């Protein structure tokens, strides 16, 4: 499938987002773009998301890639709002392209049995399934109320069941300095999956020489034409690629 796409010189990949865990939205995106001719989709590494993509395909053939990342990689981060610092200005809500922020000040039941409420004070994602970690909310918050957390998935728990579902590619987002974690996860992926793999990295945290050295080490024992390398800058922001 991928070889055919590349030979046609018309290979378009729709990145639904490693952080996009909204199954309904993913199904709609895949249905729309596959109807328009797209045959390559990048998905969050969750069984329900792969299932949603397959429903969206409605029997059409396509190349499905799931994305995982190292701790701190922007692809797998989620925005959090600190209830103590948030002033409820709604700037983050207005700029969020995913509509992942509905209320800046969250009211939660601290003691449901007593029907008591209190403003949450611990940073946590809002509508986390929709947050893709683009950072636009962070850029407009003047009260330092927004931070990020990285979702650290257990690959041994997640990937085997996705492989059983018949995925076509696994992508490792390795935009960070921790070589130990990068190669630990990369070696595990190579151990359990012998198909197409993709490496996504950038110079944001590495020098150009270090980035090239890492990529060469990662592909050294890979078979020819079974590895995709992307060095495409910061993800999902829709802004300038630096």
Model region roles, listed by residue range:
Residues 47-70, 186-199:
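Alpha-helix-loop-beta-strand connector modules within alpha/beta enzyme cores
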Residues 32-38:
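A short, Lys/Arg-enriched amphipathic alpha-helix followed by its capping loop at the start of a domain
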Residues 1-17:
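N-terminal amphipathic alpha-helix/helix-capping segment at the start of soluble metabolic enzymes
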Residues 85:
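Functionally critical alpha/beta secondary-structure elements and their flanking flexible loops
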Residues 91-126, 136-152:
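Iron-sulfur cluster-binding cysteine motifs and their immediate structural context
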Residues 4-6, 25-27, 52, 56, ...:
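N-terminal active-site wall of soluble small-molecule enzyme domains
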Residues 18-21, 25-27, 38-39, 45, ...:
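Conserved mixed alpha/beta catalytic, RNA-binding, or beta-rich assembly cores of soluble enzyme
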């Amino acid at each position: 499938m991928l070889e055919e796409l590349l030979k046609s010189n018309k290979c378009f990949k729709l990145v639904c987002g490693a952080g996009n865990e909204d199954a309904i939205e993913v199904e709609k995106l895949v249905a729309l773009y596959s109807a328009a001719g797209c045959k390559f989709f990048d998905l969050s590494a969750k069984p329900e998301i792969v299932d949603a993509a397959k429903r969206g395909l409605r029997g059409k053939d396509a190349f499905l890639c799931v994305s995982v990342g190292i701790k701190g990689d922007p692809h797998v981060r989620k925005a959090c709002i600190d209830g103590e610092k948030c002033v409820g200005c709604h700037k983050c809500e207005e700029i969020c392209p995913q509509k992942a922020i509905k209320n800046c000040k969250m009211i939660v039941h601290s003691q449901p049995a007593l029907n008591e409420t209190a403003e949450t004070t611990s940073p946590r994602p809002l509508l986390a399934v929709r947050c893709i970690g683009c950072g636009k909310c962070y850029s407009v918050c003047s009260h330092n109320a927004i931070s990020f957390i990285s979702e650290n998935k257990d690959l041994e728990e997640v990937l085997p069941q996705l492989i059983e579902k018949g995925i076509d590619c696994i992508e490792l987002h390795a935009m960070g300095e921790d070589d130990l974690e990068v190669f630990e996860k990369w070696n595990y992926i190579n151990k359990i999956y012998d198909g197409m793999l993709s490496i996504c990295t950038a110079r944001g945290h590495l020098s150009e020489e270090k980035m090239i050295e890492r990529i060469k080490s990662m592909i050294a024992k890979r078979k020819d034409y079974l590895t995709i390398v992307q060095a495409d800058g910061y993800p999902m922001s829709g802004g300038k690629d630096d």
